[in-house]
Amino acid sequence: MSSGRLLLLLGLLTLWAELTPVSGLGRPKFCELPAVSGFCKAYIPSFYYNPDASACQKFIYGGCGGNANKFKTIEECHRTCVG
């Protein structure tokens, strides 16, 4: 195979790897939990992973209760649930 074809094949494989969605196999189970504001009245902007949108989204946390799918920053949410 010529070097031009190998380079084209490598480029196509790289593109495919970048565009193929990552499966949730390595994602913690709590990332699948819904956003829960909790039962207190605080106003704490937070982030959760929305599996339907495959993205981290903002929500308001009340300060107590809730579940593990709650992050202080969108970066923390991405590191944990998106990969």
UniProtKB/Swiss-Prot annotation:
Location of the BPTI/Kunitz inhibitor domain: 31-81
Cystines in this chain: C31-C81, C40-C64, C56-C77
GO CC annotations, alphabetized: extracellular region
InterPro entries to which the protein is assigned, alphabetical: Kunitz_BPTI, Kunitz_BPTI_sf, Prtase_inh_Kunz-CS, TFPI/VKTCI-like
Tissue distribution: Expressed by the venom gland.
Keywords in alphabetical order: Disulfide bond, Protease inhibitor, Secreted, Serine protease inhibitor, Signal
Site feature location: Reactive bond for trypsin: K41, A42
Signal peptide bounds: 1-25
Compartments, record wording: Secreted
One Pfam short name: Kunitz_BPTI
Matching Gene3D superfamilies: Pancreatic trypsin inhibitor Kunitz domain
KW Transcription regulation (keyword) present: no
Function, as annotated: Serine protease inhibitor that strongly inhibits chymotrypsin (Ki=84.6 nM) and trypsin (Ki=391 nM).
Name by which UniProt lists this protein: Kunitz-type serine protease inhibitor TCI
Protein's organism: Ophiophagus hannah
